[in-house]
């Protein structure tokens, strides 16, 4: 019996040894329960298979056909991307074990149910749920995600926002509701208190709101009043938006950017609504349906950039205010923005014009009209010396306190009239007088023909009056009525001398005597070369001058800000709704055993920040991510590296559209490899060990040599004791016999 049992065991085990190796069948399979207690869960392979080590900080699970998030995710995760999967529901309590999670991206899933509530990640600041199947948002019962700053719901079939829909997020700063179904249907839209907090107070933290691609017909003051800190409002590609009017911006004084481009139904903008936005900097209305764009009171000290390209504008001098004061307003693509004449119009607006031509056309038309309607104001005796007008036709002057820092100001009185046709000039009040009718009768000779005409008049011993620098010109009531609250740079040359002003004449003739009640108008050269040089010194650079911008300079001011400040030219940049190009990684310097400094160059794209991803060679799954880096940075240190290790590092650019995609090759590759130096501690330990070994070897060798030397000394002493004399010869002396 004892011999039979081993034989049976050998017989049973023999096929497993002889057959080829087969796939191992696990003894246990891991099963996972549904997210909200689903009982119909089949046994599946472990979802944790292939996940990185427990200390990973960033993980991408895109395109894995996941129906739920794995429950064995590393607790150290800070960024999780599970886009393009089959997720159907999300509950914040499921993510409670990810205490360090900050960014969660779940774009392009099938999420149709949300549950806000306590127990979610306390540090989560970015949640992207774009392009899912959310038809409604769950009610907020408390501050579920108190640290959430950015929420993206773009592309969801949301039809309405209920009151206090975002009260769960008291720190929310950016909300993307673009391409949703808001406004579609009878009950669709935004409720009156949709952006109110838990206690009904305004959502004071929200700064950026994107409603592009929705079906809203208008912006209602009932819901926008709860956004007092709003700085950017995006209303792009809205097919039903028809008008902007009312007191919609009364409670949003911090608004800086309004983007309504590509909204084809937008036909009316009551521009006076912008009087409540003193910090306004950008207005984008390209490719809308606007026919006019009247001025309003500009109280802002910022330079306002306006884009009206692609609108069916009607030619009128009412639009010339956009080009009057380049220090206050900048019209983008003025040469490409066209206006068409009104039906049945004649005169200067008989054909289509670009808006850049309006000032010259309006100036020529106003000069001719005023010259024909006011001939009694010009008498020959005074005209040769300086044009004078009666008090009823007093020239427009600059407001009191406005300083002029050029020696010769351009004489553009007629241009001032053309720039403000909405003033009392249309009501019969005589505006500022023009110079010479002959000099301005034809706009085709502007400006040199006008200068020639004035030169001929000055040849008749007319004194040339020149304003000294830093002259303060006080305003008259008529000038204030004409200009209203819009100070302009064109009216600097037309001023009435005040007691504080200094004037001097050329030596050819004395100052002309003025009749009582007359006000002098100074005739100066228009656009002389000397004047242009001085303008360039005291004014802002020309638009054709490239900006002082280098894409690789650390802490480089963004080119858009340089352009607003200096009126210079920036390189072409892709929009903020386009995924940015990858940065160009310059290299890695200052490499030590545990740190390195990464350098890169900015791409030709709008960038809101950068991100650095790096991993040790052979450990691509265990990738570390450096959070959002400021857009002005061009270098960033990496710490906590392992000594003597080769790393692969990539720099990514980020904007509203997402992160740039790294290129595998090319001179603009955003990735590079570098190796850290060996540890100094290990090197010192090795040197110490080698030194100790050498010392020990030296001691042992010395001991061996000493011992051997002693042995040789004893042997030499024994040799000296040996007698070489045979004692036998002492008793028997040797006798030498002589052979005869």
Curated annotation (Swiss-Prot):
Fibronectin type-III domain: residues covered: 579-679
Topology feature Extracellular, residues: 19-679
Family annotation (InterPro entries): FN3_dom, FN3_sf, Ig-like_fold, Leu-rich_rpt, Leu-rich_rpt_typical-subtyp, LRR_dom_sf
Recorded topology in the membrane: Single-pass type I membrane protein
Role of this protein: May play an important role in hippocampus-dependent long-lasting memory.
Chain segments carrying region Disordered: 389-517
Region forming the signal peptide: 1-18
Gene: LRRN4
Keyword terms: Glycoprotein, Leucine-rich repeat, Membrane, Repeat, Signal, Transmembrane, Transmembrane helix
Protein name: Leucine-rich repeat neuronal protein 4
Listed GO biological process terms: long-term memory; visual learning
Polar residues bias spans: 430-454, 490-514
Keyword Membrane tagged: yes
């Amino acid at each position: 019996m004892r011999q039979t049992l081993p034989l049976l065991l050998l017989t049973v085990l023999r096929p497993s040894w002889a057959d080829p190796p087969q796939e191992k069948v696990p003894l246990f399979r891991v099963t996972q329960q549904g997210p909200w207690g689903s009982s119909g869960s089949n046994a599946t392979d472990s979802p944790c298979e292939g996940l990185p080590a427990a200390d990973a900080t960033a993980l991408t699970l895109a395109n894995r056909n996941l129906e739920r998030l794995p429950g064995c995710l590393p607790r150290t995760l800070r960024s999780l991307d599970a886009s393009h999967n089959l997720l159907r529901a999300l509950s914040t309590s499921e993510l409670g074990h990810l205490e360090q999670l900050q960014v969660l991206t779940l774009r392009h899933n099938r999420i149709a149910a949300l549950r806000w509530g306590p127990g979610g990640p306390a540090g989560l600041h970015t949640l992207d749920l774009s392009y899912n199947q959310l038809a409604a948002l769950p009610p907020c019962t408390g501050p579920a995600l108190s640290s959430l700053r950015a929420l993206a719901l773009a592309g969801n079939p949301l039809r309405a926002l209920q009151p206090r829909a975002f009260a769960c997020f008291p720190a929310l700063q950016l909300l993307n509701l673009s391409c949703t179904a808001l406004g579609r249907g009878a009950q669709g839209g935004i409720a009156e208190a949709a952006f109110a907090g838990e206690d009904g107070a305004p959502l004071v933290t929200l700064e950026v709101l994107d409603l592009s691609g929705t079906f809203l017909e208008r912006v209602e003051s009932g819901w926008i009043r709860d956004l007092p800190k709003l700085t950017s409002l995006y209303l792009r590609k809205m097919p039903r938006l028809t008008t902007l009017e009312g007191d919609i911006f009364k409670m949003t004084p911090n608004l800086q950017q309004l983007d309504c481009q590509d909204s084809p139904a937008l036909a009316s903008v009551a521009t006076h609504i912008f009087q409540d936005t003193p910090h306004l900097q950008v207005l984008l209305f390209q490719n809308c349906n606007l026919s006019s764009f009247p001025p309003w009171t500009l109280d802002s000290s910022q330079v306002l950039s306006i884009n009206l390209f692609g609108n069916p504008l009607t030619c009128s001098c009412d639009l010339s205010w956009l080009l009057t004061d380049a220090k206050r307003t900048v019209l983008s693509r003025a040469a490409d923005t066209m206006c068409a004449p009104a039906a049945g119009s004649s005169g200067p607006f008989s054909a289509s014009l670009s808006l850049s031509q309006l000032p010259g056309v309006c100036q020529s038309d106003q000069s001719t009209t005023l010259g024909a309607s006011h001939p009694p104001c010009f008498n020959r005796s005074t005209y040769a010396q300086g044009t004078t007008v009666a008090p009823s036709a007093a020239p427009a002057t600059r407001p009191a306190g406005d300083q002029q820092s050029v020696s010769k100001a351009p004489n553009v009185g007629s241009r001032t009239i053309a720039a403000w046709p909405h003033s009392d000039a249309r009501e019969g009040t005589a505006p500022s007088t023009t110079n010479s009718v002959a000099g301005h009768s034809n706009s085709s000779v502007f400006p040199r023909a006008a200068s020639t005409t004035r030169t001929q008049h000055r040849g008749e011993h007319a004194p040339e009056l020149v304003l000294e620098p830093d002259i303060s010109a006080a305003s008259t009531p008529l000038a204030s009525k004409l200009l209203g609250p819009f100070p302009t740079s064109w009216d600097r040359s037309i001023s009435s001398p005040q007691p504080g002003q200094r004037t001097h004449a050329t030596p050819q003739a004395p100052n002309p005597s003025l009749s009582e009640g007359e006000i002098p108008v100074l005739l100066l050269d228009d656009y002389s070369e000397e004047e242009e040089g001085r303008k360039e010194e005291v004014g802002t650079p020309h638009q054709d001058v490239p900006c002082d911008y280098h894409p690789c300079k650390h802490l480089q001011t963004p080119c858009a800000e340089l352009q607003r400040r200096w009126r210079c030219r920036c390189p072409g940049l892709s929009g903020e709704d386009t995924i940015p190009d990858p940065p160009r990684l310059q290299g890695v310097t200052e490499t030590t055993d545990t740190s390195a400094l990464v350098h890169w160059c900015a791409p030709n794209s709008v960038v809101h920040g950068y991100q650095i991803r790096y991993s040790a060679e052979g450990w691509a799954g265990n990738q570390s991510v450096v959070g959002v880096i400021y857009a002005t940075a061009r270098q960033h240190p990496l710490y906590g590296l392992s000594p003597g290790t080769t790393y692969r590092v990539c720099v990514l650019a980020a904007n509203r559209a997402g992160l740039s995609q790294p290129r595998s090759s090319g001179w603009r590759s955003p990735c590079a490899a570098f190796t850290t130096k060996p540890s100094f501690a290990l090197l010192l330990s090795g040197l110490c060990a080698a030194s100790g070994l050498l010392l020990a070897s030296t001691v042992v060798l010395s001991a061996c040599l000493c011992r051997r030397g002693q042995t040789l000394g004893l042997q030499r002493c024994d040799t000296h004791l040996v007698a070489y004399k045979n004692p036998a010869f002492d008793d028997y002396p040797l006798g030498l016999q002589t052979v005869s």
